[in-house]
Amino acid sequence: MDHLPMPKFGPLAGLRVVFSGIEIAGPFAGQMFAEWGAEVIWIENVAWADTIRVQPNYPQLSRRNLHALSLNIFKDEGREAFLKLMETTDIFIEASKGPAFARRGITDEVLWQHNPKLVIAHLSGFGQYGTEEYTNLPAYNTIAQAFSGYLIQNGDVDQPMPAFPYTADYFSGLTATTAALAALHKVRETSKGESIDIAMYEVMLRMGQYFMMDYFNGGEMCPRMTKGKDPYYAGCGLYKCADGYIVMELVGITQIAECFKDIGLAHLLGTPEIPEGTQLIHRIECSYGPLVEEKLDAWLAAHTIAEVKERFAELNIACAKVLTVPELESNPQYVARESITQWQTMDGRTCKGPNVMPKFKNNPGQIWRGMPSHGMDTAAILKNIGYSENDIQELVSKGLAKVED
């Protein structure tokens, strides 16, 4: 297979990934492959571009490094072109409502007839099967969080609240990426393709597991946090200093002992409620939990963030300032690791945003291209799989493909 023009880089160089999906979850899966060196083809509807394009800046990050194909993959010759593309594809990711592709005739079995080694990742809100009530429903970030038990655990004691920005989309997209790579590893051993059913609510169920395990195995419901503080443990969570906010984790025998000296509670060490060797202070079960919070709040409020960070570094207590977005660029750790970078958009503008992550030492990822325009690479992709200029023009004339204007 001849690859589309692009630099060779990263741990996934030579891999062809195709995805069909809009907005965040499915495309995020594909875009991670693209930043790690895979050749990634983004399929868009012919008549309507991906709705993410209406956003002024985010698409320049979420669709960088991609090849844009505008094709009606469900109809006539457009379907034929799509299936021909699948013959040279390693991984196909689709994000839709339940078994939407199967309902329209593109089943796993049809895809495997064209490529027996194909890895297929289906990403949906409620999965490819289950009850009719749920399987075909649309789902976004908040839907998956609400249905999974994740949302009810977040927010304040007075009201649950979703975790933003779009947590379920990113967790689900990354799950699709890792699952597809796991499947590909097995396919290369067996030469037999794989189909993966990723339900967003199940991803969030797994991500929300920590406190739920106490309910499943004992009926204990975890309370939601109060003003950003850990629902169970004193000295853990969000706290206000004289000039802003920090997060901290008061964990460890020595850390608790030294911190208690600073906040005037050293006399509690070694009591039945806080015996020697205590590593965490339970804010509910320990009768002194509220007092610890009260004293810690007062001590922190009387000190600046810089003073707190300096003292906690001496005590080996984990803490960090809650950075504002404008503070990120100048933070020395961000600068040292080039966590924020710049790249050129297709129309020549400079775009700034997060760099490729994680950092591979021997085969690093890179940004080689901005977001392509709608249908920008349609002709090149179709030529790559054997279509002539006349074939492409015929698809365009029938409304089955769109090429760049």
Curated annotation (Swiss-Prot):
Active-site residues annotated for this sequence? 169
For molecular function, the Gene Ontology terms on record are:
L-carnitine CoA-transferase activity
- EC number(s) per UniProt? 2.8.3.21
The subunit structure is: Homodimer.
Name of a matching Pfam family: CoA_transf_3
Q: Its gene?
A: caiB
Per the UniProt record, the source organism is Escherichia fergusonii (strain ATCC 35469 / DSM 13698 / CCUG 18766 / IAM 14443 / JCM 21226 / LMG 7866 / NBRC 102419 / NCTC 12128 / CDC 0568-73)
Q: What is this protein called?
A: L-carnitine CoA-transferase
Which cellular component, as a GO term, is one annotated location?
A: cytoplasm
NCBIfam families assigned: PRK03525.1
Q: What keywords would UniProt list here?
A: Cytoplasm, Transferase
What InterPro entries has UniProt attached to this entry? CoA-transferase_III (IPR050509), CoA-Trfase_CaiB (IPR023452), CoA-Trfase_fam_III (IPR003673), CoA-Trfase_III_dom3_sf (IPR044855), CoA-Trfase_III_dom_1_sf (IPR023606)
The record's subcellular locations are: Cytoplasm
Name its pathway.
Amine and polyamine metabolism; carnitine metabolism
Q: What does this protein do?
A: Catalyzes the reversible transfer of the CoA moiety from gamma-butyrobetainyl-CoA to L-carnitine to generate L-carnitinyl-CoA and gamma-butyrobetaine. Is also able to catalyze the reversible transfer of the CoA moiety from gamma-butyrobetainyl-CoA or L-carnitinyl-CoA to crotonobetaine to generate crotonobetainyl-CoA.
One biological process GO term for this chain? carnitine metabolic process
Taxonomic lineage is: Bacteria, Pseudomonadati, Pseudomonadota, Gammaproteobacteria, Enterobacterales
Catalysed reaction(s)?
crotonobetainyl-CoA + (R)-carnitine = crotonobetaine + (R)-carnitinyl-CoA; 4-(trimethylamino)butanoyl-CoA + (R)-carnitine = (R)-carnitinyl-CoA + 4-(trimethylamino)butanoate
- State whether keyword Ribonucleoprotein applies: no
Q: Which family does it belong to?
A: Belongs to the CoA-transferase III family. CaiB subfamily.
Which residues are involved in binding CoA? 97, 104
